[in-house]
UniProtKB/Swiss-Prot annotation:
Chain segments carrying region Disordered: 155-223
Active site annotation, chain numbering: 95
Sites of N-acetylmethionine modification: 1
Metabolic or biological pathway, per its Swiss-Prot or TrEMBL entry: Protein modification; protein ubiquitination
Gene Ontology molecular function, alphabetical: ATP binding; ubiquitin conjugating enzyme activity
Enzyme Commission no: 2.3.2.23
Source organism per UniProt: Bos taurus (Bovine)
CDD domains documented for this protein: UBCc_UBE2S (cd23804)
Top class in the EC scheme: transferase
Subunit structure: Component of the APC/C complex, composed of at least 14 distinct subunits that assemble into a complex of at least 19 chains with a combined molecular mass of around 1.2 MDa. Within this complex, directly interacts with ANAPC2 and ANAPC4. Interacts with CDC20, FZR1/CDH1 and VHL.
Keyword Cell division found: yes
Positions carrying Phosphoserine: 174
Post-translational modification: Autoubiquitinated by the APC/C complex during G1, leading to its degradation by the proteasome.
Protein name: Ubiquitin-conjugating enzyme E2 S
Length: 223
């Protein structure tokens, strides 16, 4: 995609540069901005999935594209990370009012990013680009949330409700296997059957000693 920097007036470029620099140094909570040094009109962004939503624990990559008419016209927003959301189309396009009819030249990039993050908390089924997600949100929220969580786990880097960390008190399959396979682990087979194992070891040593004694007697008889 061609850069729009050359199409923007110098004073707009300075304003964009100033805001992007501020956003990079002091981003909104849960949002990080990665400016494109070669193209200031192509902003790469990551947004953390808000807690209490099906997107919690996920990290979503997106981009904002500033057109040649910016700020008279709103930027275009796209999710680069696949997400199940009513207001995100199959190509990642984001449908939110602030990027359309509610846009004014006074609104800045920070406002856009905060609005998109809020969209993860409060989806709007009335302006759905993903009709299935919009329908489920209205008719069967549990199914909608399950689908959203699944895609978040697959594509957003989430491993569960705590973002990939096992929940307290819940053993993982690998942890259980490790405990079973390690006979020296506390509470494992060796720990639970220590006295019995020692008893068997003692009996085995006695049998070996008796066998050696018998073999020695047989050897003496041959002499």
């Amino acid at each position: 995609m061609n850069s729009n920097v050359e199409n923007l007036p110098p004073h707009i470029i300075r304003l964009v540069y100033k805001e992007v620099t501020t956003l990079t140094a002091d981003p909104p909570d849960g949002i990080k901005v990665f400016p494109n040094e070669e193209d200031l009109t192509d902003l790469q962004v990551t947004i953390e999935g808000p807690e209490g939503t099906p997107y919690a624990g996920g990290l979503f990559r997106m981009k904002l594209l500033l057109g040649k008419d910016f700020p008279a016209s709103p930027p275009k927003g796209y999710f680069l990370t696949k997400i199940f959301h009513p207001n995100v189309g199959a190509n990642g396009e984001i449908c939110v009012n602030v990027l359309k009819r509610d846009w004014t030249a006074e609104l800045g990039i920070r406002h856009v990013l905060l609005t998109i993050k809020c969209l993860l908390i409060h989806p709007n089924p009335e302006s759905a680009l993903n009709e299935e997600a919009g329908r489920l949100l209205l008719e069967n929220y549990e199914e909608y949330a399950a689908r959203a969580r699944l895609l978040t786990e697959i594509h957003g880097g989430a491993g569960g409700p705590s973002g990939g960390r096992p929940e307290p008190g819940r053993a993982t399959a690998s942890g259980a296997a490790a405990s079973t396979a390690d006979p020296t682990a506390p509470g494992g087979p060796a720990g639970a059957e220590g006295p019995m194992a020692k008893k068997h070891a003692g009996e085995r040593d006695k049998k070996l000693a008796a066998k050696k004694k018998t073999d020695k007697k047989r050897a003496l008889r041959r002499l």
